[in-house]
């Protein structure tokens, strides 16, 4: 196994099976963040992740963290909160503000560089990247964004400025995603937060098999049209 240097003149990627074991999933470096290359990456279970000042790094870890949306873990305390939720949840109302919120609210330091923000904004303009917003009155208090692959949604990042805001984003999205034919959410690498919400690890090969099938399954017509998904309970 060796790290592959990508060419700027080809958007092809090596097989994810050739990714390094340590660091887990590192597959390639270089290339660019053009829409065509990003879409090629997601179609093959690969995503970019790198720190400011580093070259672009491409990953496909094994195991892979995923969330079956029907298995979202709704704790008793979160259920009580949601039943009296003060939040309004929307879809694709404020993509730029959501990715900016994610970039500026990472305790461990952001990996969302200006280049990443610009690249995913282009994907959003092309209809491939989407945001879920959580509002309290007129204030954006949380949200998440990711990339659609048919009936699979590749979650990229989330943020929260008030209690349970990011959990609310994922909870409401899961319910809506299921209703419109969504089957699986890619969480990339398991962490304590996503694990607490029901995410699990599966072998990379299983994830790639799911991806190959689900990306060919369309969601219900006009699912990604901007709209309100949830209104406050009080």
Swiss-Prot record:
One of its GO terms (molecular function) is leucyl-tRNA--protein transferase activity. One of its GO terms (cellular component) is cytoplasm. Its main location: cytoplasm. SUPFAM superfamilies: Acyl-CoA N-acyltransferases (Nat). Keywords: Acyltransferase, Cytoplasm, Transferase. Its EC number is 2.3.2.6. InterPro entries: Acyl_CoA_acyltransferase, Leu/Phe-tRNA_Trfase, Leu/Phe-tRNA_Trfase_C, Leu/Phe-tRNA_Trfase_N. Pfam families: Leu_Phe_trans (PF03588). It catalyses: N-terminal L-lysyl-[protein] + L-leucyl-tRNA(Leu) = N-terminal L-leucyl-L-lysyl-[protein] + tRNA(Leu) + H(+); N-terminal L-arginyl-[protein] + L-leucyl-tRNA(Leu) = N-terminal L-leucyl-L-arginyl-[protein] + tRNA(Leu) + H(+); L-phenylalanyl-tRNA(Phe) + an N-terminal L-alpha-aminoacyl-[protein] = an N-terminal L-phenylalanyl-L-alpha-aminoacyl-[protein] + tRNA(Phe). It comes from the Bacteria. It is found in: Cytoplasm. It is an enzyme of class 2 (transferase). The keyword Transmembrane does not apply. Belongs to the L/F-transferase family. This is Leucyl/phenylalanyl-tRNA--protein transferase. It comes from Salmonella paratyphi A (strain AKU_12601).
């Amino acid at each position: 196994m060796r790290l592959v240097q990508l060419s700027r003149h080809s958007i092809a990627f090596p097989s994810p099976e050739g990714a390094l074991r340590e660091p887990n999933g590192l597959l390639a470096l270089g290339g660019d963040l053009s829409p065509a290359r990003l879409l090629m990456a997601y179609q093959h279970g690969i995503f970019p992740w790198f720190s400011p000042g580093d070259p672009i790094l491409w990953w496909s870890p094994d195991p892979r963290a995923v969330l079956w949306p029907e298995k979202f873990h709704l704790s008793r305390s979160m259920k009580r909160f949601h039943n009296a939720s003060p939040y309004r949840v929307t879809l694709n109302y404020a993509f730029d503000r959501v990715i900016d919120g994610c970039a500026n609210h990472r305790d461990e330091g952001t990996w969302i560089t200006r280049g990443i923000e610009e690249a995913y904004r282009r994907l959003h303009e092309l209809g491939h990247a989407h945001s879920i917003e959580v509002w309290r009155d007129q204030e954006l208090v949380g949200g998440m964004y990711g990339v659609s692959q048919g009936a699979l949604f590749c979650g990229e990042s989330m943020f929260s400025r008030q209690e349970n805001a990011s959990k609310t984003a994922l909870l409401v999205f899961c319910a809506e995603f299921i209703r419109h034919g969504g089957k699986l959410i890619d969480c990339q690498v398991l962490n304590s937060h996503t694990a607490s919400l029901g995410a699990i690890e599966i072998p990379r090969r299983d994830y790639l098999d799911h991806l190959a099938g689900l990306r060919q399954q369309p969601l219900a017509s006009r699912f990604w049209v901007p709209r309100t998904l949830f209104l406050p309970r009080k």
